């Protein structure tokens, strides 16, 4: 496809210095670090695909219902249940005045829409919407619809109101006979964030699919998308949209929604449930703790991808559950059905309107194919062998019928470890075209791992970085991600696709942080991370121009810090703690025969000395850290005996503890007791240094030993060496990449300065002939700055810089991402 990324980037800016918005290139600070960048314009770097950067949409944090899907009524079909959330009932978000009950009987609207509301004569029902209520704006129009039936004539009075009174003139709808769809339109007379939709019946009536949509949806489409959110996604100019998940895809039952399955309400995301008339789409529980109406379904995802010029990239379940469930489904008939469903999905997307599933697409309003080229099977499976056995069967069936489709595999939920290594081995041996990697790590990890893909096999499977983020929405997180993205671009011959995750978060329904775009029922705002993604996506270029920069020296000095004990959703007893210096001197010894006065409780949970052990008894509490010792300790051996008493996981044994946000810990039996890892926390964000599969037994005492020497750590479990690592990789704050825009001829010099010092930089363009004035876009802010609904400290500033030659000096502001567009002559 042909897309012009630059138009919303630096090329769109007026060529004027933005006075007061960004530090000028000649600014000097007391704290300045000198760097150099050397560009080789004659060398040919990696080509960058149009689709390199994209977005990943998953219905998490109410991203769909109550978010991108513009429906204003919550629980419009009375289908909420305890399968979705233990607090839910079929009348969640509704209040009945008079008599009314939700019924599941043969009088329903259709077989796949099981519930409806039976409303008594003279009664009414009121919906509260999402967040604080239904948002309406003065002068704007809203479309109401309802499926209803009545044995005798009944008049429905439909009203929009809030605590202060009416929000629009009420409408009346005459209902008589069997199920039929009725419509009305409102024009809001006031603006309110706390609206309610009320439906009153003068005689008995049955109601289902009670709906209210703003007329002003994205592209004015029916069953459409919330305009501001869709426009923010479109403004990124993503090369692809990965959907619908995520953990939604590969968790829950793999059965369908039918009488044969008992109308299974906790299913994996199965695309056929989500197409066709919305009143016939089978509701489902959401892995993240609420309900999915599927009003936003596969057709809408494909349509939105097409509308924004992005490649659709759907993900289908592989019949191996992940996200902590970790179960392989052994049912050959069910596997064959899912494989056929996947073939049918390709037909739905690409088949002619005369084909079975192409006809469904055409009847929904899109006779032309959606041009699907990539499809992913599975998501973050922790059972690589079982997953890959099924993946190969999916791939063989797809290649036999649709050889032009790229079938994407994955490498599990982490950036390293046994599962990751096994998955990659299987993918390489089977000549898989593309492998999806996922990781969520600390900003420090992203600064340390800019070179991650430098050593990947150029002839092996290509990488799809389908999910990544640096565990926060502060500017320091955006800086670290920007630094990492320069490495992604530099390795564009290996990394073909990359998308930040998650995309959207409703601030009143949060299951996961950080997120790219935040919103409530009245507004939406860009995170600092969004501004980074937008800057890169709109200024990609078509080819890497090789360049080099001076770097930070390797880390020196030993690992220093006290020791700690912690738990995560687990009750644990610790005993016989001993810390010994390298020369044999005892630094700490505690058998808890007395009290725990040597320990400082800095986390959650409930600690006490019981029967000569230090016990954490709250099996629901997370990060229950207690610390002991001196933060200046180095070169020591830590021994502790640990016994799991109850709960979901195992032990957390910390070392190198500087404070509550900076430490290492050995996480034994983490991730719902499926694997163990060493994690490093830097300023509160954690990154994984080492992982292995394994679990911890309840009631068994384990001997745990950690040996720290310099920057090398060796770990022993029950006297056997478990693993080790050397933490000597610098968190490089200065990163760069240079690309060329073939259409404009511009060289785009992209520099990240993730430190509180300016970076005075000598830039050598290697003889390239360029115009004397550069167009500049800068993101700069305090490292802890966070964009909110009312304040956006991280906002792009545009300017020009004069004095560009083939060798010039530019001072990059502290804590900044800067793109220089240099016009070649």
UniProtKB/Swiss-Prot annotation:
Segment forming the signal sequence: 1-29
GO biological process: L-arabinose metabolic process
Keywords: Carbohydrate metabolism, Glycosidase, Hydrolase, Secreted, Signal
Any Pfam family matching the protein: ASD1_dom
Domain CBM-cenC: 70-215
Record-annotated active site: 380
Subcellular location: Secreted
Temperature dependence: Optimum temperature is 55 degrees Celsius. The enzyme is inactivated at temperatures above 45 degrees Celsius.
Record-listed E.C. numbers: 3.2.1.55
pH dependence: Optimum pH is 5.5. The enzyme is slowly inactivated above pH 8.5 and below pH 5.5.
Keyword Transcription attributed: no
GO cellular component: extracellular region
Major site of localization recorded for this protein: secreted
Reaction catalysis annotation: Hydrolysis of terminal non-reducing alpha-L-arabinofuranoside residues in alpha-L-arabinosides
Domain of life: Bacteria
Residues under site feature: Important for substrate recognition: 607
Protein residues bound to alpha-L-arabinofuranose: 58, 247, 379-380
GO molecular function list: alpha-L-arabinofuranosidase activity
Family recorded in the similarity comment: Belongs to the glycosyl hydrolase 51 family.
Function: Involved in the degradation of arabinan and is a key enzyme in the complete degradation of the plant cell wall. Catalyzes the cleavage of terminal alpha-L-arabinofuranosyl residues of arabinan present in the arabinofuranosyl polysaccharides or oligosaccharides. It cannot act on other arabinose-containing polysaccharides and arabinoxylo-oligosaccharides. It leaves most of the polymer intact, including most of the main-chain residues and the arabinose side chains.
Name this protein carries in UniProt: Extracellular exo-alpha-L-arabinofuranosidase
Organism: Streptomyces chartreusis
